Regions:
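Bacterial Sec-dependent N-terminal signal peptides
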Residues: 1-21
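Acidic/His- and Gly-rich active-site-bordering loop/insert found
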Residues: 19-125, 135-152
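Extracytoplasmic/secreted proteins, especially bacterial periplasmic and envelope-associated proteins
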Residues: 21, 28, 32-35, 39, ...
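Soluble non-cytosolic domains of exported or imported proteins
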Residues: 27-31, 44-55, 127, 131, ...
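Divalent metal-coordination and catalytic microenvironments
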Residues: 40, 79, 92, 130, ...
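Metal-dependent amide/peptide-bond hydrolase catalytic core
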Residues: 63, 244-423
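Histidine/acidic-residue-rich, glycine-tolerant segments that coordinate divalent metal ions
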Residues: 114-125, 131-132, 143-144, 149-271, ...
């Protein structure tokens, strides 16, 4: 794999680029990346509270001579590296926040951090791999800073807080970074992001053109009927019955109105609130759920059908119903032209056979908001020991990854940067 990468570097674009020098730089950076990852893993911080994480990132970027901006979207850090010649601007993004999860494994760098989250005592853990993303991007920054005389253009390193979502009542994450101008001054031409996966083998890269992760919407339906005695339902209007009919109707949208051979879609109800006593039919009910879509037109269709079902079903049973939809994340939509341009970069690092097309998932990712502004490519990095089919899912207390996969992330981001800026 190294021969493919460095052969391209030597003979494809940079004839004066030293294969042995770059190879040694990767060898030297790997233990640093692993050490950074372990530090962040042992010292995790929740969304919009990544103060010490941001300090360590900023200190490293400043030591490399980068222009550094802190306090972006509360705790974000942005580093700017200007190459030897002017040119295009590329952004590389890593998320830096942890989760309110109590770690259960026996790693020597296991998190022992405790906090109160939503009035509940909990541990704090990097249970989604953001510690690895942060360490990888710090490593990329060091490699590119050492070779900035080979860069034609500018690299913007975006260390983003609150990907998991800001605390209730706060702004944060990618939308706030965009609002504060992270893609401006200089204007970014394209953005790249990665996510490590505990179920993909080390040395593999996984991607999908178009919708790769779902738009996530939260919906609230409020139903109004007429309260009455449970023994005399004919004297009232039962909002629980209306809610049941609406929920049933929502599932018919998926099975009868969406073209599932194109993309997947999901409507799930997660909470229903109604009534006070077993013998009273209540006045109102409320139920809350999520919509997951991978196509913007399908999302529009689903919401329109949900509105129609709410109104018409409630009217048919003598009640009223309202639907409120709140966007949580947009569709993580990989620009097809950009993917086509960058696939050779991935293949040079891990080999064509290890760059694999994946199916879309119905999880969400706020990298999607960057992609709404500029072309972007979001892909997945293997973090499972080869041959070991046992893995622990993300967002669980036992989650862990094989650290030998981190250097692949450093190499891939480095290759993509050189290729994009020198095309």
């Amino acid at each position: 794999m190294k021969n493919l990468l460095f052969g391209f570097v030597c003979f494809g674009i940079w004839p004066v680029f030293s294969q042995s020098t770059l190879e040694q730089q990767f060898i030297d950076i790997e233990p640093k990346v692993i050490a950074w990852r372990r530090h962040f893993h042992q010292n995790p911080e929740l969304s919009n509270r990544e103060y010490k994480t941001a300090e360590k990132i900023a200190s490293h970027l400043k030591s490399l001579g980068l222009e550094v901006e802190t306090g972006v979207a509360k705790t974000g850090v942005v580093g700017l590296l200007k190459g030897a010649q002017p040119g295009k601007v590329i952004a590389l993004r890593a998320d830096i926040d942890a989760l309110p999860v109590t770690e259960r494994n026996s790693l020597p760098f296991k998190s022992e951090v405790k906090t109160t989250f939503l009035n509940t005592e909990t541990g704090v853990m990097h249970a989604c791999g953001h510690d690895t993303h942060t360490a990888i991007l710090m490593g990329v920054a060091e490699i590119l800073a050492q070779n900035k005389n080979k860069i034609n253009g500018t690299v913007k390193f975006i260390f983003q807080p609150a990907e998991e979502g800001p605390p209730p009542g706060e702004e944060g994450g990618a939308p706030l970074m965009i609002k504060e101008g992270v893609l401006k001054n200089p204007n970014v031409d394209a953005i790249f992001g990665l996510h490590i996966r505990s179920n993909y083998e080390v040395g593999t890269i996984h991607y999908k053109k178009g919708g790769t992760m779902a738009a996530v919407d939260r919906f609230i339906v409020q139903v109004k009927g007429k309260q009455t005695h449970g023994g005399r339902p004919w004297q009232g209007v039962d909002p629980i019955l209306i809610s049941a009919k609406i929920i049933d109707g929502f599932q018919s949208i998926i099975s009868r109105n969406t073209k599932l051979v194109d993309e997947a879609a999901v409507i799930s109800v997660g909470k229903i609130t109604a009534g006070t006593r077993f013998n009273i039919i209540p006045e109102t009910t409320e139920f809350i759920g999520t919509i997951r879509t991978l196509d913007p037109n399908m999302r529009t269709l689903i919401i329109e059908r949900m509105e129609s079902i709410c109104t018409n079903v409630a009217t048919a049973y003598g009640g009223e119903a309202s639907l409120q939809v709140e966007e949580q994340t947009a569709i993580t939509f990989n620009d097809s032209n950009l993917v086509d341009k960058m696939l050779p970069s991935l293949e040079k690092v891990v080999g064509k056979e290890n760059v694999r097309i994946r199916k879309a998932t119905t999880g969400g990712e706020d990298f999607s908001y960057f992609q709404k502004e500029i072309p972007g490519f979001y892909f997945f990095l293997g973090g499972m020991t080869p041959g070991n089919k046992k893995f622990y899912p993300h967002h669980t207390p036992d989650f862990t990854i094989d650290e030998s996969g981190l250097i692949t992330g450093v190499k891939v981001f480095t290759q993509m940067t050189f290729d994009f800026l020198n095309q």
